[in-house]
Amino acid sequence: MDYNRARANVLKNVSMVTFFLLNPEREVSTIAILVSFNGKKYRRSIHESIPVNLWNNDKKRVRVSAKYQQGNIINDTLSKWEVAALRTLSHFKEYYNAPSKDEFFEVLDREFYKDEVGEPTQK
């Protein structure tokens, strides 16, 4: 097997969870989650919006300031999404095949909302 093919196989099997702004050119943007698994990428909004100038692109978190104290709450929510995504990845690693987008987000939502009283209302 040549180097490029071997490298591609290794990269394909790397899992990653990160966050990004859907509209970084605007003044306020929605935050989205991006999860990659077995070469497939899953992305969608997490229904949180922030002023773009408060986004720390290196840390993938909101800058907390005296003027924007709700940044702590949003960062806690991002951490909760990240943990749910890692649990979801663990669930699908048993099967070795990347799930469909709908299957992936069904399990992710179940992991994220499992401590909530009600079920999620949006997909």
Regions found by a protein language model. Give the residues of each.
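N-terminal helical hairpins
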Residues: M1-N9, E25-R26, K41-K123
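Short amphipathic beta-strand and strand-loop transition segments with alternating hydrophobic
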Residues: S15-P24
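Hydrophobic alpha-helical membrane-insertion signals
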Residues: V28-T30
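Short strand-coil-strand connectors
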Residues: S36-N38
